[in-house]
Amino acid sequence: IVLPKLFLGPDRFYHDPERELYGMDLYTGGTIIPYPMQQLPGSAYWLPDEEYRTMILRIGANLSRAGFRVLVAHGHGPSTHQFAALEEEMKERYGLICFTAFDVLENTPLRYQNDHAAANETSITMAVRPELVQMERFAAGEEPVAMAGEDPRIHASADYGRKILEINIDA
């Protein structure tokens, strides 16, 4: 069974009296081009760590009660890492074996979703849902904001995406 996507998760944050910024709203390195702190379009997913942890444990309890033995979760980096940190507790409390796609392969360019809006994620989308990739939306001469990883304009392709998927499925 595949549960609906969770649109809330943990991430780094910055609060001051005038604004709240989360995740890639904050430049902290690792992106192709540095950029100022700003609220990015679509940045609406943040949940405090403890609330996220409580939610994941409740999901684990419900799935265990329904007879599930294995729970696989993967998504946005911080939520994936926090889910992984709960693997032992989920096993002890609910008898659930938990893992993420990061558990399957070591850190490699072919690891599933190992960047942020860059060549890896773009290539996966090109392979699975090519109609969603709109490379023409990159403004001519402007560098992308909030991208971490290899530049998809140069390195992304449907073939690369299929290779990522095949390697991870086989692993």
Predicted feature residues:
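Extended, histidine- and acidic-residue-enriched regions that form the cofactor-binding/catalytic faces
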Residues: 1-171
